[in-house]
Design a protein with these regions (language model features):
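Short, compositionally biased
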Residues: 88-94, 142-156
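Short glycine/proline-centered loop/turn elements that form peptide/ligand docking sites
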Residues: 116-117, 128, 134-143
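Short peripheral tails and domain-boundary helices/loops at the edges of structured domains
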Residues: 148-178
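Surface-exposed, glycine-biased beta-strand/turn segments
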Residues: 2, 18-96, 125, 134, ...
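Bacterial N-terminal signal peptides
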Residues: 8-16
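Short histidine-centered loop motifs in beta-beta connectors
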Residues: 59, 66, 101-127
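N-terminal Sec-pathway targeting helices
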Residues: 1-7
């Protein structure tokens, strides 16, 4: 009964957030936000595919991780809680940063070696926020940073948080200095699966 009530509350809040997303997108369109390539100091490479959902793994150990646009740091994890024997999905990212962009897009960086910001911090495009590393299950794979981009949900539902639009298209543009916004791609995903936040919350 309590779980059903929780899901209902999350569903209602998700509807409010979706409306806020649309309203905020309208106001955001009136002022162009700046985007930058979010890795520096070390040359990085990244693929154009991912396991079974849209995301990008970026390789270039110890590269500086930068804020791709302006926004608020919503959440950080500064302790690597991943245990290989348990392999809990919510801990696989190790050290993480979740940025709620002013564009109403959520940017999730995981497997970091160092986190340089705190929840609630305001960041600007190109600000140094972390360092690429091998925390979480990257301890048994390879040093890299996972970048997931998604809509903003009421909470950090892991399934949506890890990614729902392809970052590489935007990384390609930002690397060339092209100010390409992911807002339209995010909005298309919301129209296709409007209940994704609450469905993910029910699975957590």
């Amino acid at each position: 009964m309590l779980r059903r009530l929780l899901v209902l509350v999350v569903a209602i809040f998700a509807t409010i957030v979706s409306t806020a997303n649309a309203t905020s997108d309208d106001s955001t369109n009136k002022r162009e936000l700046k985007y930058v390539f979010p890795f520096s100091k070390i040359p990085v490479t990244y693929s154009r595919d991912h396991i079974d959902y849209p995301a990008t793994d970026v390789h270039g150990c110890y590269a500086h991780v930068l804020a791709p646009t302006s926004g608020i740091i919503f959440d950080v994890e500064k302790k690597d809680k991943w245990d290989e024997k348990i392999d809990a999905p919510g801990t696989r990212g190790g050290l993480t940063i979740t940025l709620h962009g002013d564009d109403r897009v959520r940017y999730f960086f995981s497997h970091l070696g160092r986190v340089k910001v705190n929840a609630g911090n305001r960041v600007e495009p190109g600000q140094w926020i972390g360092v690429m590393g091998s925390s979480g299950n990257a301890r048994i794979t390879k040093c890299h940073t996972h970048l997931g981009m998604s809509r903003i949900c009421p909470q950090s539902e892991y399934k949506v948080l890890q990614g729902e639009i392809w970052p590489w298209r935007f990384l390609d543009a930002w690397r060339k200095g092209i100010n390409k916004s992911p807002v339209q791609a995010k909005n298309r995903v919301i129209k296709t699966s409007p209940q994704a936040c609450e469905l993910a919350a029910a699975q957590d």
